[in-house]
């Protein structure tokens, strides 16, 4: 636990010295008072996939307690196409574990993601966050295990073309400056996302890099660490919001579109998954892919058409899912293969202590690498 709190980038975790999963209303109030926070934002995804925001000025302590406890009502028909205007009122209730400081607000502002509730005070059955929660709970109830996930968030930065140090077309993977033009933008995005609670694995420039009609198109990626599947989804929502807002401040344009033009790399939203039990990764057994992992992969193969229906709702997805573009075109799986539907990436299964080999002064590490193995669904995007 101490290792998770030390050097934690989340500003509230750093102050409260507890993981975000343990945040209480009293913790939120304490932080607001100590840091002289003047506003609170409720944020929640709508049917268009964007985060919506409701602003509150903290009038006094009683009002703060009221909004944190009772939430607020909103017009569901303006958020979701499946809700009729004749009976559209919904409640939005903040989830304290998602609290973060808004890096873009001039006034000190604390934001939280919210859950939707219906008129009877019950979770809205068709809301995005509750649908995911039900699926996660059903998995745990049936298997006795926990489903964890993380996303690879790919996007293009679009800016005016420049002549200095031009990048090589479609050779932008892990490129450094000055050939990669937007490393500073990406690292600032990563800083803001981490301060908001995002568990980031790494960031880098991606393959896609081209010019078109006087504009530079540079592809980048921010990848996360495996976590509870509901938290993984929350982190992706906040990350997209951060990237768009920071791009606006920089005077840049951003797109998460699956495909911009033919022959150039598309942007996916690859999802890595692992199955946990009692804190142990169940994806490996004796250094090879476990029966549990193989059953999970088989399930993804069987449900490929349904997964595609939900994971590829943008028509341009189907210009991305073409041969020779590191995108799946067949229902199959394989080790280390970026053209299959489900990829089994390198998982540090070899017993070699590579750190000690690269650094002869280091003692044997005895690091448990079994936690690192995942499988990756490569079809989703958007």
Segments from the language model and where they lie:
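ATP/Mg2+-dependent ligation/transfer catalytic cores
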Residues: 1-210, 227-241
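C-terminal accessory/tail domains of diverse enzymes
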Residues: 2-35, 43, 48, 64-65, ...
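Structured core elements
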Residues: 43, 53-55, 113, 156, ...
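Flexible loop/turn segments at secondary-structure boundaries
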Residues: 47-52, 120-121, 157, 209-210, ...
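Short glycine/proline-enriched loop/turn "hinge" motifs that connect secondary-structure elements
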Residues: 101-109, 146-148, 212-216, 263-264, ...
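Histidine-centered divalent-metal-coordination microenvironment in nucleic-acid enzymes
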Residues: 113, 152-166, 209-223, 257-279
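Generic secondary-structure signature for well-ordered alpha-helical cores
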Residues: 137-144, 191-198, 245-252, 278, ...
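Gly/Pro-rich turn-and-neighbor structural signature
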Residues: 204, 223, 237-262
């Amino acid at each position: 636990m101490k290792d998770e709190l030390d050097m934690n980038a989340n500003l509230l975790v750093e102050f409260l010295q507890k993981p975000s999963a343990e945040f209480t209303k009293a913790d939120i109030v304490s932080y607001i008072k100590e840091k002289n926070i003047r506003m609170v934002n409720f944020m929640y995804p709508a049917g268009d996939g964007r985060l919506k925001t409701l602003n509150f000025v903290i009038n006094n302590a009683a009002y703060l307690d009221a909004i944190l406890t009772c939430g607020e009502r909103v017009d569901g028909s303006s958020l979701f196409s499946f809700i009729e205007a004749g009976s559209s009122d919904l409640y939005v209730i903040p989830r304290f574990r998602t609290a973060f400081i808004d890096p873009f607000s001039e006034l000190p502002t604390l934001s939280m993601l919210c859950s939707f509730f219906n008129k009877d005070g019950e979770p809205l059955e068709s809301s995005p966050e509750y649908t995911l929660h039900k699926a996660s709970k059903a998995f745990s109830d049936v298997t006795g295990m926990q489903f964890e996930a993380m996303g690879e968030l790919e996007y293009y930065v679009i800016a005016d073309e420049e002549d200095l140090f031009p990048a090589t077309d479609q050779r932008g993977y892990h490129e450094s400056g000055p050939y990669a033009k937007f490393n500073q933008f990406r690292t600032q995005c990563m800083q803001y996302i981490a301060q908001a609670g995002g568990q980031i694995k790494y960031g880098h420039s991606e393959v896609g890099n081209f010019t078109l009609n006087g504009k530079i198109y540079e592809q980048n990626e921010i990848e996360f660490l495996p976590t509870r599947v509901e938290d993984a989804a929350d982190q992706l929502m906040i990350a997209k919001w951060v990237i768009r807002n920071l791009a606006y401040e920089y005077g840049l344009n951003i797109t998460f579109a699956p495909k911009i033009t033919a022959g150039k790399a598309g942007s996916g939203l690859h999802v890595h998954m692992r199955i946990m039990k009692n804190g142990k990764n169940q994806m490996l057994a004796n250094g090879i892919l476990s029966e549990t992992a193989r059953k999970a992969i088989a399930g993804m193969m069987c449900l490929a058409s349904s997964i595609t229906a939900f994971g590829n709702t943008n028509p341009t997805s189907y210009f991305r899912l073409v041969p020779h573009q590191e995108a799946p075109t067949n229902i199959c799986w394989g080790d280390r293969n970026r053209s299959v539907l489900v990829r089994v990436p390198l998982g540090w299964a070899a017993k070699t202590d590579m750190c000690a080999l690269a650094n002869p002064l280091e003692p044997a590490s005895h690091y448990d690498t079994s936690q690192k193995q995942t499988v990756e669904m490569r079809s989703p995007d958007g």
